[in-house]
Amino acid sequence: MFTRRHFLAAAGALSAVPMAAQAHHGWGGFDREKVLDHTGPVARSTYANPHGTLYMVKDGQELTIELAPTSRLQARGLSAEDVAPGKTLRVYAYQNRGNPNVYRAEWVEVAGRRIELR
């Protein structure tokens, strides 16, 4: 028998799913006052959903730079080849409030082109 307690448990579990997705995909966790403006080679990268990711080294620390979803990257003209390891990019990004080595890119410059990611 489906009781009120079962209903409340199910409703609580289902309501947590959008919050978890928002925590990952929402940009409120990034501090627009803490900007990274860095030019350097890509150490490694992923070009896959939920979003592309660059890994770059600055002052001996590996930084994780989250990009837009691949559909947006493609629509804006940023290919997997553009962010391949060894490519030199300029990245303008905001620091994550909880992890100082994670950033969200606002834009990247590659081969003289600036690609806005928002």
Segments from the language model and where they lie:
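Short boundary/loop segments of OB/S1/cold-shock single-stranded nucleic-acid-binding domains
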Residues: 22-34
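OB-fold/S1-family single-stranded nucleic acid-binding modules
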Residues: 97-118
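Short nucleic-acid-contacting surface segments enriched for D/E, G, S/T with interspersed K/R
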Residues: 75-90
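Short aromatic-glycine-enriched beta-strand elements
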Residues: 49-56
